């Protein structure tokens, strides 16, 4: 089984939705942790941290979803650059979805 563009787009969108839901669930826990280490303002304003966290989560969720649908490791590895391009080209929309939580 190999990736087709439509399958990859659907999996990417599912991975994005899963990531947004997970981010909403753990947001309060993250904020509590940041307050405990007394670097709340520094970490909240560190956009790179959040973007890296979100991109890493989308990629991880994509891999999990693809494995659940029995795609091979080779197929997944070949698709990841396209997933990264999808994420980068849609980062504004992704950040807006996260910010609206």
Where are these regions (language model features)?
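Intrinsically disordered or highly flexible coil/loop and linker segments, enriched in small
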Residues: 21-32, 67-71, 96, 100
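Amphipathic alpha-helical binding modules
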Residues: 71-101
């Amino acid at each position: 089984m190999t990736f087709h563009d439509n399958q990859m787009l659907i999996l990417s969108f599912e991975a994005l939705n899963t990531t947004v839901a997970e981010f909403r669930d753990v947001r309060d826990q993250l904020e509590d942790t940041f307050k405990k280490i007394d670097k709340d303002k520094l970490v909240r304003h560190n956009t790179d941290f959040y973007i890296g966290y979100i991109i890493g989560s989308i990629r991880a969720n994509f891999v999990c979803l693809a494995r659940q649908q029995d795609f091979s490791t080779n197929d997944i590895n070949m698709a990841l650059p396209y997933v990264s391009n999808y994420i980068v080209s849609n980062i504004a929309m992704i950040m807006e979805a996260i910010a609206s939580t």
